[in-house]
Amino acid sequence: MWNSSDANFSCYHESVLGYRYFAVIWGVAVAVTGTVGNVLTLLALAIRPKLRTRFNLLIANLTLADLLYCTLLQPFSVDTYLHLHWRTGAVFCRIFGLLLFTSNSVSILTLCLIALGRYLLIAHPKLFPQVFSAKGIVLALVGSWVVGVTSFAPLWNVFVLVPVVCTCSFDRMRGRPYTTILMGIYFVLGLSSVGVFYCLIHRQVKRAARALDQYGLHQASIRSHQVAGTQEAMPGHFQELDSGVASRGPSEGISSEPVSAATTQTLEGDSSEAGGQGIRKAAQQIAERSLPEVHRKPRETAGARRATDAPSEFGKVTRMCFAVFLCFALSYIPFLLLNILDARGRAPRVVHMVAANLTWLNSCINPVLYAAMNRQFRHAYGSILKRGPQSFRRFH
């Protein structure tokens, strides 16, 4: 069943005559949604000042990889399913296969970079600007495409139409063992690395939450002693205290506005000193101080409330990052498992097609996540759709 169709480029099979129409409808929806959503994302990154961060260039890179697939490659996939025949020749079949796997590899590499950046921002904020400097970001962006192309270019002669999935891909038998190694590196090692980084992020968030919980208890104890007897003000003391917590709110700490994909991070205020470690230290320092002025209690309470809200900000980021990663992984896991468990191609052809078509989701889902979980992206999308060209003048 996995034999390539290099002679007539046909993927005709009686068992998929009905399913192909569903695949065509699904493919058109993915192409339209992905193209519109990813174009809106690029425009939002270009015109929204708070989204113009160095780190968000990774989001742009992920968006370009998705746009390559949705806009350029997906229409040919739809046409092939509609006619059950590849109609653009052998050379473009090879080009299609190379671009397809380049897009996938760039997406995985970018997701790894985003996860690494998010982890450094939380756990090692002083290291973040060194790794993700302007030069480092450019090298990472260019490197992801160079690595993607060069890793799959050696398969040029084995890119053919694979009838079981009705797509130009590499011939599984002729490409071994190189293809097995590549798939292991990108989809097993790559996705596992992303998962590990997000587990580490979750652990850092929990540590910060525990530290701020301790700070809250200490704060309550201090206020009780304050009400009992301390009435004398200490000039300038609250200003120092407020600058330690209140000013390190979401814009300077871990932003609740995600990236990318994903995603993950938008970094509305891209501060290199942000992170769970920084906020945790601030909470611990403030917990050691006293609050002597009763008449300034409302301001102090507001500052403390912003400090104790930090874990929820961390939680939003973690949930967003996990959602982007989860959507990407879930779109590929059925296809990967099916290829491992059904190496001899005994499963019905329609099962292979359904699993392959599910992978299309990862190229169009990220803009939906950005709109649903990111206020800045949501506002930028809305402004572009409502105002059109006027939105460009508005954000300059």
UniProtKB/Swiss-Prot annotation:
Record's comment on post-translational modification: Phosphorylated by a subset of GPR84-activating ligands. Constitutively phosphorylated at Ser-221 and Ser-224 in the absence of 2-HTP. By contrast, Thr-263 and Thr-264 are phosphorylated only following prior cell treatment with 2-HTP.
Transmembrane annotation, as ranges: 22-42, 58-78, 95-115, 136-156, 181-201, 321-341, 353-373
Xref: Gene3D superfamilies: Rhodopsin 7-helix transmembrane proteins (1.20.1070.10)
Domain of life: Eukaryota
Positions bearing Phosphothreonine: 263-264
Glycosylation sites: 3, 8
Modified residues (Phosphoserine): 221, 224
Stretch list, region Disordered: 241-310
Keywords carried by this UniProt record: Cell membrane, G-protein coupled receptor, Glycoprotein, Membrane, Phosphoprotein, Receptor, Transducer, Transmembrane, Transmembrane helix
Subunit structure: Interacts with ARRB2 and ARR3.
Name used for this protein in its record: G-protein coupled receptor 84
Species classification: Eukaryota, Metazoa, Chordata, Craniata, Vertebrata
Gene: Gpr84
